[in-house]
Each structure stands twice: as C-alpha cells, then as structure tokens.
Amino acid sequence: MATAEIEEIPALLKPGQTVAGLDLGTKTIGLAVSDLGLSFAHPRPVIKRVKFTIDAQVLLKALETDKVGVIMIGLPMNMDGTAGPRVQATRAFVRTMQPLTDLPFVFWDERLSTVAAERALIGMDVSRGKRADRIDSAAAAFILQGALDRLHMMRRNDYDAG
C-alpha cells in the first residue's frame, strides 16, 4: 500500500497490531512503537544508517518484531508550513520503501518534535552524549504520541457525536 491518512488508521489495523513512528535523520532513523491500545508511544533503539538496503532490512525486521500495521513518518515542514529539502528526502524514502512492504505510511507534521524531545531528555537529566544517541527515537516517540493523541480525540468526537 502507498500512503494513507490518519483517519484511515483504525480501519487499517488488524487486531494485535501497533503503529510505528519514524523520525528520519541523516545518520539515524528514530523509531517508536505504540502500545496495543494506541495510547502510548514507546521509543525503540535508533537505527544507525549505513545504506538504504541495510537500513530498510533492519527497519522492516524491527517493524515485524513489534507487529506494526501502520507507519507514521515525521514530515519535517519548515516553520512557515512550506516543504523544504528534508520533506523531499522523506517522501523519497517512503517511495523507495513502498515496494518492500505492504504497510501503509501516514505522513505527520513533525515541526518542533526534535526540540520537544531534547527538552524532555534534558528535563530527565540525560547527559549530552546519551541525548545524542537517543534524540531521534525520542523525536519519533513525540511524533507518534501526537498522532495517537489525535486518534484518541477523533474517537472521542465520534463517541460524543453518536
């Protein structure tokens, strides 16, 4: 499958599947995975980028291990809402991944996710060296948590309307 919208996620997930969040960096891929209730994002170890074929193999194995049904990928928009070069790189990554997996990708605006992740790690008194190792997975968790919160609000609005 190609890409999907956040509203489609509940229909795309099979029982027992989770949602993954990705934060693409130039040197690492941050990964986070939801719980089965789609309430909480849990950071996973970062994937050190080597070359695409290896990166894809490692990522797909991690997604299989966590029984992922949908991939939420951070779209690094500029602060003014325009698409910059990193947006193009993210879209290219998804296009290259699509032939390798049937999992749908959902783009999610990730503005300020890395800033929020760094502040959270500083607040937890994580040393500068360890922050560098964890920042992309923490950012992936922020991206995913934002999407999970949106899904929760959508479910609540559907319940209130019904």
UniProtKB/Swiss-Prot annotation:
The keyword RNA-binding does not apply. Keywords: Cytoplasm, Hydrolase, Nuclease, Ribosome biogenesis. One of its GO terms (cellular component) is cytosol. GO terms for biological process: rRNA 5'-end processing. This is Putative pre-16S rRNA nuclease. HAMAP family: Nuclease_YqgF. Could be a nuclease involved in processing of the 5'-end of pre-16S rRNA. InterPro entries: RNaseH-like_sf, YqgF, YqgF/RNaseH-like_dom, YqgF/RNaseH-like_dom_sf. It is found in: Cytoplasm. The keyword Ribosomal protein does not apply.
